[in-house]
Structure formats: structure tokens, C-alpha cells
Design a protein with these regions (language model features):
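Conserved S-adenosyl-L-methionine
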Residues: 108-208
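Class I S-adenosyl-L-methionine
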Residues: 2-155
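Terminal (typically C-terminal) long, contiguous, charged/leucine-rich segments with helical propensity
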Residues: 210-212
Length: 212
């Protein structure tokens, strides 16, 4: 079977039924998040290491191997099929979207359509120099990814000219956004934040900030 969202979903569904799909999915997210965040964020490094080791103890070698395989497939999807909200799609296909919190993940084709209406203005600003793009309720990063995809299609090198500052109150959502913005190669600061009170619970830079 080729590399695809469906393949990742099936791998997650094939795990032992000791835990629900939502718990398995978000533990996979955490395993990737801890690994990426620890490459370029010193604050909280040891805590993330401890949490990663806790995941190993919780799930064991078989499930952790599945996590590694799914992670590798996600990387390949970004490299070979381009930018997309892959984690949002996997999240939806597993049926673990959180209706109780009123969460809604925008379909990626709509995110790109919205980006198309704004991209000319973004490109004009880029002609003047580096720019910052903000999203205070970013979810899995779908709208931001849509804009990056459109910029890339138009031949714009956003990696050295665009800084994203995004946040979400939901810790799982911002971790999804952080992973995908990392894989998209963009400079980003991602915050677990209450946009109303301005309280910040965590803040992390992506690897792309090293090039910005």
C-alpha cells in the first residue's frame, strides 16, 4: 500500500484496543511534537523528554514503532504530495474531532480558496520585505497551510520571508499546527494561548526560524 492519509488511519486503527482512537492519535501527535520541539527549544526540554519516555512506557515497543512509521509517512506526504492539512484529515477520518468543544477543522480546499482571495496582497507586502502572519485560533493550522501552499504554487520562497505567529487554546490543536508548520519548513512561533485573556500556557519555535 502506498503512502497516504488512508494508510496512516489504517495503521492507527490496527493497534490494540486498549486505548480509544482519540487517545492513540493524540499520543502520536505528542510523540512528534516532543521530538520536533526539543530540536530548537531549550525551555521545557527535560519535561518533554520525560513525557516522551512516559509515552514509551504507556504504549510499548509495538505501538511506538507504529508511531515512528506513521511519522515517516507524514514526512513523505509533505515532501512528495505537497502542503496539506494531513493531520486534520487523519483526525477527521478517525472520528475523533471534538464536537463537545465546538471544534471545526476547515476542509483544505476551502482554506486554499480563501488564500487565493488574499494572496495578491500578501505578495505585494513581500515585495517590501519580510512579513508576519498571525492566526489566534489556528486549530491544526489549516488556513495557514492553505496560504503557504498557494504561495509555493506561485513560486514564492516563504521560508526566508514569512514569519507565522499562531495560537490556539486547545493544546492538541496547537501541537498539530506546530508539527505541520515544521514540516512545511516555515518560520513559526506557536502558542498554547487564551486569545481573550492573553494567558500563554506554552510557546515554541519551529526549526524554520533558524533560517528566518
Amino acid at each position: 500500500m502506498g503512502i497516504s492519509v488512508d494508510n496512516i488511519v489504517k495503521k492507527i486503527q490496527s493497534t490494540d484496543q486498549k486505548y480509544n482512537y482519540d487517545e492513540i492519535f493524540f499520543d502520536w501527535i505528542k510523540s512528534m511534537f516532543y521530538a520536533y520541539a526539543n530540536t530548537c527549544n531549550t525551555e521545557g526540554y527535560e519535561d518533554r523528554e520525560k513525557e516522551f519516555n512516559r509515552l514509551i512506557e504507556k504504549h510499548g515497543a509495538k505501538t511506538m514503532q507504529m508511531f515512528y512509521e506513521c511519522h515517516a509517512e507524514l514526512v513523505i506526504l509533505f515532501e512528495e504530495k505537497g502542503i496539506d492539512d494531513y493531520l486534520g484529515k487523519i483526525h477527521h477520518q478517525l472520528g475523533v474531532h471534538n464536537k463537545m468543544k465546538g471544534q471545526f477543522f476547515t476542509p483544505f480546499h476551502l482554506a486554499k480558496m480563501m488564500a487565493e482571495t488574499q494572496v495578491d496582497g500578501v505578495i505585494k507586502k513581500l515585495e517590501e520585505g519580510k512579513i508576519k502572519i498571525t492566526d489566534q485560533a489556528c486549530g491544526s493550522g489549516c488556513l495557514l497551510l492553505g496560504l503557504l501552499a498557494v504561495l509555493k504554487e506561485k513560486g514564492i520562497n516563504y521560508q526566508k520571508n514569512v514569519l507565522i505567529v499562531c495560537s490556539d487554546l486547545d493544546e492538541n490543536a496547537i501541537q498539530m499546527a506546530y508539527i505541520q508548520l515544521t514540516l512545511a519548513g516555515v518560520a513559526a512561533k506557536c502558542e498554547n494561548k487564551n486569545a481573550l485573556t492573553e494567558e500563554i500556557f506554552g510557546s515554541w519555535f519551529t526549526l524554520g526560524t533558524l533560517l528566518f
